[in-house]
Amino acid sequence: MLSIFKNLLGTSEEDGTTQEANSKDTKGLKEERKRKKRKNKYKIPPGHTQQDWDALVASGKNLSGVESPISVTAEELAKHCSPDDCWMAIRGKVYNVTAYLPYHPVGPKKILKHSGVDATKPYLKHHDWVNEEELLKTSFVGYLV
């Protein structure tokens, strides 16, 4: 009979803890994880918001590093995978994303991870709603061949 009341009250016979206490512990762990996640978030440098990037693109400044579109082989693309020279292909188009690195909302590491290669699959997995042609129109290098 006592075990029935303990079950109704949410008390564990094994350790005497209540479900309420366990719930608080779980809540505390979740809050701690959230704090750590916020603490580790990338902080966008001043002057590098999405609006700042949009203004740079609207200025018409050529950020591609080439005067006119070129044909880019996979071998050539692979040479451009550093923070100082970062290209990636998305949907058959190659972009010089070097200038965009400090503007990316989660930081340059995510872009650099996929630089120098055809990044279409990972790009679409995380950015299927983003119009990369508009976002990177002044960074267009050419076509992947």
Swiss-Prot record:
Record: residues binding heme: 104, 127
First-listed, main subcellular location of the protein, grouped into a coarse class: cytoplasm
Matches recorded under Pfam families: Cyt-b5
Biased amino acid composition, Basic and acidic residues: 22-32
Region (Disordered): 1-49
Domain Cytochrome b5 heme-binding stretches: 69-145
Domain of life: Eukaryota
Entries under InterPro entries matching the protein: Cyt_B5-like_heme/steroid-bd, Cyt_B5-like_heme/steroid_sf, Cytochrome_b5/Flavoprotein_Rdt
Keyword Oxidoreductase: no
Biased composition (Basic residues): 33-42
Record localization: Cytoplasm
This protein's UniProt keywords: Cytoplasm, Heme, Iron, Metal-binding, Phosphoprotein
Modified residues (Phosphoserine): 68
GO molecular function terms attached to this record: cytochrome-b5 reductase activity, acting on NAD(P)H; heme binding; metal ion binding
GO cellular component term of the entry, any: cytoplasm
Listed PANTHER family: CYTOCHROME B5 REDUCTASE 4, CYTOCHROME B5 REDUCTASE 4 FAMILY MEMBER
Family membership noted in the UniProt record: Belongs to the cytochrome b5 family.
Protein name: Uncharacterized heme-binding protein C330.03c
Upper taxonomic lineage: Eukaryota, Fungi, Dikarya, Ascomycota, Taphrinomycotina
